[in-house]
Amino acid sequence: MAPDGVEDSDYESDPDELNRSLATRRREASDDDEDDEEADDHDKLRAAIQIHSDEHSGVVVVDSDDNEGLHIEDSYGDDDDEEEDGDYGQVDDHVEYIADNNDKTIVAGNGTDDSAATDLVDGEEQKKKEPFAVPTAGAFYMHDDRFQELDAASNRRMRGGRRLWQSRDERKWGHDKFEEMNTQKQQYDRRTSRGRGRGRGQGRGQDRGQSRGNNSKEFTGNGHQNQFPKAVTRGRGARRYEVALRNGNQAPSVQTKQSQNSSVEVSHVDLGRPPTETATLETEAIQAKKNVFASSLNSASPPFYPSRSNNNLAQKDVQAGMGRLHINENPNPTGKKFGNTKSSSLWGRTAQTTSHGRGVPPHGQVLYQQSPNQGDKVSSPMQIRGMPKGTDQSCTQLPGQVFNQHSAVISLLPSSPPKTGSSENPYLSGEIESAVETGALVAKGKGSLQPSGRGSFMYGGTQFMGPAGMAAGHGNPNFPAFLPVMQFGGQHGGVPTFGMALPGYFQPEHGTGNPEMTWLPILAGPGALGGSYCPPYTVLDGSYQADKPGLPSSAGSSSQENSSNNPNDEEPMERPEVTNNGNSQRSNSNPNKQPRRYSEMSFSK
């Protein structure tokens, strides 16, 4: 007992206090142990209560094996509490099961049953990560997003094995999508252009809008439909216009040929004439002809007043030609100035051509027919005798032309300016006298210059058209009042040509009459003189032909005799007459109804 005593002697200061301290020391030790265990349990339960607070804080409903709910409460057990609890019966030294009114047991742990409490708490801790552990009630029920991200992400990612938002959010960006759309559109356009574009020119295109182009190709009728690929659409319009021009130029080609022939004729006839003068004559003649046709050529037509420039040209031609006419009898006219000799030869021709008395043709019968190669030449009024019949000079190729008293256009039309220039007489005093000699030379070999039958007659060296026995100075009421014909320059020595006075100005007893009167010398149609005009014409092969083509021209008689009897004589050529289309015309009057015996001539088609 010594050690015990020693210990007692060491520890006890007061025996009473020592006994009391031992008793209390045990209690406090047990209390400390219980407090430690209870503190641990309290911390664990408090965490579980904070997580699983359903109805009120501090109580949690736990499912047990027998499906009874257990209310776990904190027990701050003291000795008094333990004693009071012991009245209900202890199952264990540290854990007491207390039945309440709700058939639920309050479990309080005292440290001995730590494993059971820990298992419960661990089970709750394991359950807190599950979705049902998320609070569905409480202050922040709608704002508790602790598990929403994970839960929503997991559901979003794993539903159906793919993410729900992949189709919308993980697709290409907008610009990538735009490029993809453009790529598809380009592919679509490429396909459609391949199908529709090629089809336009081919089978399908003929059904759609290409019939116009196909019609243009069919319109050609040249067999060139397959010349170009049908898919090529560029030259289609040009080809259509080309076809139109090709078709339209067929008719003008004839006129072009005629104009070319006329230019050739002018070149043959006017070898010595300057081209500018010829052009001037042509233009003036065309204008004069237009003026005459515009007036319908009836008795009410105003007189024709030629311009002074034409007079000058006429005078010049007369002066140059009067002295050369007798030289022109040689058969080869090459090198001669036929442009200058034309007027003089015509002036002298009037006497010879009408001298055979073919007579004035009946009223209403004139045939203006143009030779095929007859052209615009205004300055080729006469052909030299002995010229070949097939030369370009159209005077030998005039088909039978019947002059119509109502169609005496040729006598008035001033296509050759020398004719119009002779309307003023003062300058013709000396040269016209020489023209009389010229007329005699031209008329040689013609036979008698005496009129026979009804028609032309000679008066003062000039052939005068009218009824037989009617002289220039004798007025005959039977003579047509329209466009009368008389001796031109009869007061000046008798010029071998005709003058025609317009209505209201004819004064046969005074010759030319008043100075204002316009006398038109007949340079073209020696027999083409007579009554009023008759406009109707029929065009045959580019020539004018009157209503009654059966009557030959009166002036053709002398030409006929010239060509048949006198091959070396100068054949009379009718005055060229420029029509609206630029082709010259000449008139011959042949009242005897005898067709000319020219080899080139076709009489009245």
From Swiss-Prot:
InterPro entries hit by this protein: Btz_dom (IPR018545), MLN51_plant (IPR044796)
Compositionally biased spans, kind Basic and acidic residues: 41-57, 166-192
Residues annotated as transmembrane: none
Localization (cell): Nucleus; Cytoplasm
Region (Disordered) location: 1-88, 101-132, 151-275, 350-380, 544-605
GO biological process, one term: RNA splicing
Keyword vocabulary terms for this entry: Cytoplasm, mRNA processing, mRNA splicing, mRNA transport, Nonsense-mediated mRNA decay, Nucleus, Phosphoprotein, RNA-binding, Translation regulation, Transport
Positions where Phosphoserine occurs in the chain: S30
SMART domains: Btz
Chief localisation class: nucleus
Domain of life where this protein originates: Eukaryota
Any one GO MF annotation of this record: mRNA binding
Composition skew (Low complexity), residue ranges: 552-567
GO cellular component: cytoplasm; exon-exon junction complex
Biased composition (Acidic residues): 1-16, 30-40, 75-87
Compositionally biased tracts (Polar residues): 214-228, 247-265, 367-380, 578-593
Coiled coil start-end: none
Record text on subunit structure and interactions: Weakly interacts with EIF4A3.
Protein purpose: Core component of the splicing-dependent multiprotein exon junction complex (EJC) deposited at splice junctions on mRNAs. The EJC is a dynamic structure consisting of core proteins and several peripheral nuclear and cytoplasmic associated factors that join the complex only transiently either during EJC assembly or during subsequent mRNA metabolism.
Family: Belongs to the CASC3 family.
Name of the protein described by the UniProt record: Protein MLN51 homolog
Gene name in the database record: MLN51
